[in-house]
Swiss-Prot record:
HAMAP family: UPF0179. It comes from the Archaea. Pfam families: UPF0179. This is UPF0179 protein Mbar_A0292. Coiled coil: none annotated. Belongs to the UPF0179 family. It comes from Methanosarcina barkeri (strain Fusaro / DSM 804).
Amino acid sequence: MTESDTKITLIGSRLAREGLEFIFKGEMPECKKCRLKNTCLNLEPGRRYRVERIRNKDIHECFLHDSGVVAVDVSKAPILTTLESRKAVDGAKIMYEPPKCGKRECEIYEICHPEGLSRGDKCKIVEVLENLDSKCEANYSLKKVKLSW
């Protein structure tokens, strides 16, 4: 991981631990009056990130986090999802398209439509994991994959 792959942001001190993954929700009303908001809000809302390193233990006051916030390096976290089996090739670069399926009761619906990934995102297949054909209620030929975005 290079420094250009990471961003500096602030996170609640109770949450700050290496390896923590989170979905950045964006600006809250309390953020409007904060002098540090530009550092906190430099991530893309709705995306999944991972804390790579805690920069230091200095705690900054925050209107949202009662225990304050600390500076951390974060990177874009890989996302588990499904792809058509014929497109699931290690190292391939793809434009993400979720399966055309409305079967919300399906046991793999959440992984087929993961939070933090959007239709049209340019991604790389980091790893092809398992065949999910038998679990798909729409009878699609699917594989579980790990994507970087």
